[in-house]
Amino acid sequence: LDFQFWIHNLQIPESVDLLVIGYGSTLRCDDSVGLRVADTIEAMNLPGVHTLTCNLLTPELAETISQASRVVFVDAAVDAEGEIQLRELVPAKSSQIFAHAAEPGTLLAMARDLYGRAPRAWCLAIPVDNLQIGEELSEKAQRGLTLAVEIIRKLAE
């Protein structure tokens, strides 16, 4: 497999109220659910909403995050108890990253520390079953995708 880091749609328009960041791997079945949610939202062309997809959360996202009024991070959650979870985030105390990928709270701290602003943000965790190599979504992930799109649509109103 030829694995490369990528971010799609990094530049955002000036008037973005809601930034939706879907992340995960297209190679691992349900792990792609965050990406698919963002792609579905993008196709809806909701006013004031911009989507961004990436395989990992990295420091390059901090500037883009600082430019949005609100941000929703969308990801697969293996340990979720069967229910989709929307939880409000706060910036981490430190903006330092000690691994190859960042957590949403760390990116919010980086946006605050480097660009002077951390927007209101949430993590939307979608319960999943299957992280094997492949492209199919499980029924559980598909149900979560549908519900996640509805939650984001309501946030965008």
PLM segments and residue spans:
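N-terminal catalytic or cofactor-binding beta/alpha core of small enzyme domains
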Residues: W6, L10-V128, E135-L147, I151-E157
